[in-house]
Amino acid sequence: AIALGQSYLNIKKKKIKLEMSQAIAAVGQIHLAGEFQKLFDKNKFKSGQILITPDDTEQRRRALNVRRTFDNLFKLKAIPIVNENDTTATSEIKYGDNDRLAARVAQIIGADTLIILSDVDGLYDKFNKNKIIKKVLKIDNKIYDLAEKKINTYGSGGIITKLEAAKICMNAGCNMFLGNGKKNGALERMIKTKSYTHFVPKISTLHAREKWIISSLSSSGKVYIDNGAARALMDGKSLLAAGVTKVMGNFEKGENIMIVDEKDKNLARGLSSFSSLEIDKIKGKQSGEIENILGYLSKSEIIHKDDMVRL
């Protein structure tokens, strides 16, 4: 939208202030939607536009609203065209790439497959430039080491954002395929030649709420816990204040945070029942002491087991 707006307004500057780029995006967005509609009209398809910011996917209530909008567009037999809302997104709070945006949308709407089209035939082994890694079952350091990390090789987002997108999909039980969209008949060609990388999802037993928690783009903070609390977590228990030893980050009640053990190993993610300031006051304390310390008691658990996904 920004690039199209610059072209329409005949702005040739490469460095533009955030406030101005948001206004330029507003101009470009109209023309971008118009171009899409022309293409769909030629083939007698209806379409609708959804503009998204991270707030729309990272806040649970708003994510559910996004899903309802998609569901209703499908009922209307209209194809959703999704883009980041560059008119309101800031440099601090934005996706900045379509890979993770697409994966998060796929997770929210419960899609079984996401196809990302780039300018290459798949994920290449950097030690053998002619070899495409056909199937990825797990994204770990080996995959990051194998992958060529040049941004311009895999489009604007680069290979890192594509691997992050694949992680989101795999955790949500969604297949992801990476292939070449630069050639005519891209999807048909991918199927016929099998020129793609398939990121195979885990067999997911998670509920939609749990998928949303684990697929969050980032955690707002961390709480460190002792060994006793770590064992309780692995037994399926909630996290209590008594087991918390340290808080890192600045977050509010309801935000997605990481639970970490004494060896700095990530154990779980969950929605905090308290802000970081509140947890700092009650860490190491018994549940019965919370009301006296804070002056009120909303919940006795730092993170309830139903709001937590173990990693």
Language-model-derived ranges and their functions:
Residues 1-311:
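C-terminal catalytic "cap/lid" subdomain
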